[in-house]
Amino acid sequence: MPTLRYKIIPVFSLLLFLFSGQLLVAYGQLKSDSVTVSGRIKNLTIQLYRQSPNVTISRNNILQASRELARPAPLEPDGSFKVTLPLVYPYEELYFNFGQISTAFLASAGTIEIALDADSLFLSDAPFRFSGANAQVNNQLTRYKVFEFKNKPKADGRQLTRKVEGRSAEDSRKILTNEFITTYEKYRETHEILPLLDQYIKSGVKYEVAAFLYDKASAEQDTRLETNVPISNLRPANDLFLTVQRATALERFSLYAASRIADQDGRGIPVGTFANLVDRYIRDLSETERARINELKTGRTGTNRDMPMLQRILQRHQDTLAKLLVYETRMSHLRKVVDTTGLDYLKANFLATNLPTIELKNQELLYQHIMPQVGDPHYRLSLEELYRLEVKDSATINAVAAKFSKQINQPVEVLSGVTLLRSSRYGKELIEQFQAQAQGRLIYVLAWSPDVEASRLELQAARALQEQLGSRDILFVYVGTSETSTELWRESVAKNKAKGLHVFVETDQFDSLIALMRSDVVPAATLLGRDGKFIKRDAPLPSKPDEVLKLLREK
C-alpha cells in the first residue's frame, strides 16, 4: 500500500561527515490580505437549493498543488451568499462552484460580487456577471473561457513529447510556449485584451510550460535544466499571480529536485547538525552525554568512540529525532543541487507535504523546527495557513484520545454520531461486527488509510455524501489502517468528524477485507445488504456521489 514513510538514518553514517553549521534564514514579515466574495443567484428554485444549499469558493495554496482550499457560503432564501477568504499573493485564481456550474476568476484584496440567474444557468455559455475588484478583467475572462472551451485543441501529451524530442531545453520551452498559447493568441486577433488579464493568462502559460519541462527533465535525468533555461522562465520569484499552474510547476520542481538526489539515499548529515538537534530537542541526557554533545555541536570531529552514545540517544528518542533527521538530511543534499530560492520552497514544501501524514505532536515539532528556516514571506504565510488547518481541531483530537485509546472490540462513541472501534477480527467475522452495529441498515464500507492522500480525499468526500443523504437508512463504515500509527488514524477521524462507525485494523486484517471486496487498490468501497451480504463489492467511491446515490436508490 503506498504511503509516505520516514527512513531511520543509521547513526554510523553521521560520523562520515565533518561539522557544518546551520544558519537560520532571515525573513521578513508579511500579512495576508483578504477578499470578500458575495453575490446572488436570482430566481433560485427549491429544487436547485436542495441540490446545492451552498456555493463554494476555493483557492490554491502554492505548497499543495493537489488541494483546493474551499470555503462554503450558505445560500440565503433570496439566493444571496457571502464569504471572506485570505489572500497570500497580490492576485490569486479563485473558483466559484454551484452544483454543476463553475468558473475561475481573478481575486485581489477588496470585494468581488458575482451575479447569476437560475433561469439561464444551463442556457447561457457565460451566466456570470462580475462587479467590484477586477470586474472588467473577470467579465472578459469569462468570455475568453467560453472561447477557449470551444476552440482549444484536446491536449495530446504524446504529440507534444514528439515535438520536443531531441531538442534543447530552451528550444523545448519556446515550442511548448507556442503550443500552449495558441488559443489565446487566436482570441487576441479579434479582441482587445485588458493588460492585467494578459499578464494573468501568460503567467499561467509560463508555469504550464515549466511543469512540462520539469517532468521531461526528471524522466530524462537531465541535471542541467535550470542551467540551460533561466530560472526566471521556470519559477520566477516575483510573479504577482498564484494559479493552479504555478502550484503545479513548483510541485514538479520538487519532484525534479528529489530525482537529482536519489543516489544520496542512506547518506547521513554532519555530526554537528545531529548534535545540535539533540541539544535542542532532547532533555534527558546524562552529564557525560551532554558534555560530549556540547563538544560535537561546537565543531569537534566525531570518533568511533562516540558511536555507542549516539546510537543510544537515537534509539531512546527515535520518534522525535527520526523526523528531524529526515528533514535535515534531505536539505543537506538538496542544498548542493538547487539555488537558495528553490531551497526555500523545498523547505516549506517538505513540511506541507508531510503535515497530513504525521501525528499532531510531530506536526508541532516539525513546524517549530522548519518555519524559522523559511525566508520567503509568501511561503511562510502559505505554510502557516496549512499548519493552522491541520491543528485547528487539536482540542477535539485530545478529547477523542481521552475517550478512546486501547479498547479492543469495544465500540466507543467519541463525538456525536462518530463511533470508534479497534477490531481484532478478520474477513467475514469483521463484516459480522459491522452488521451488529448496523442493526438492520444497509452498510456502505470505505476502506482507506490516512497514509495515502487519495484515501484522505475520499474520507472528506464521504462526509459530503452523508450530508446529501441526510437521515437515510444506511450505516457508513470506515475501515482504516496506518503504517504510521493508530494515533494518526484516530486524529484523522477526529478532524474529519464523518458520522458512522470508524474501525481500525492492522494491515493483515485490512488485506483480508480488501480480498473480500475484490479490490487491489486503496481506497476501495463496497455495499452490504441488511443481512450483511455483499450487494456490490466494487462499489463507487464517495468522490462519485451520483453513482453512489444511484446504487443506493436501487436498493
Model-identified regions with their sequence ranges:
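Short, internal strand/loop/helix patches
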Residues: R490-T526, R530
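Structural microenvironment flanking redox-active thiols in thiol-disulfide oxidoreductases
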Residues: A454-K495, Q509-L513
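Oxidative protein folding and maturation machinery
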Residues: S131-G440
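Bacterial Sec-dependent N-terminal signal peptides
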Residues: M1-S34, K555
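Non-catalytic, surface beta->alpha helical segment in thiol-disulfide oxidoreductase systems
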Residues: V521-A524, R530-K555
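Short active-site neighborhood of thiol/selenol oxidoreductases, capturing the structured segment around
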Residues: E432-A462, L475
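A non-transmembrane, solvent-exposed segment enriched in polar/low-complexity residues
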Residues: Y27-P195
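Loop/turn elements at helix/coil->beta-strand transitions in domains of secreted/extracellular proteins
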Residues: Q439-I443, R472-L475, K497-L501, R530
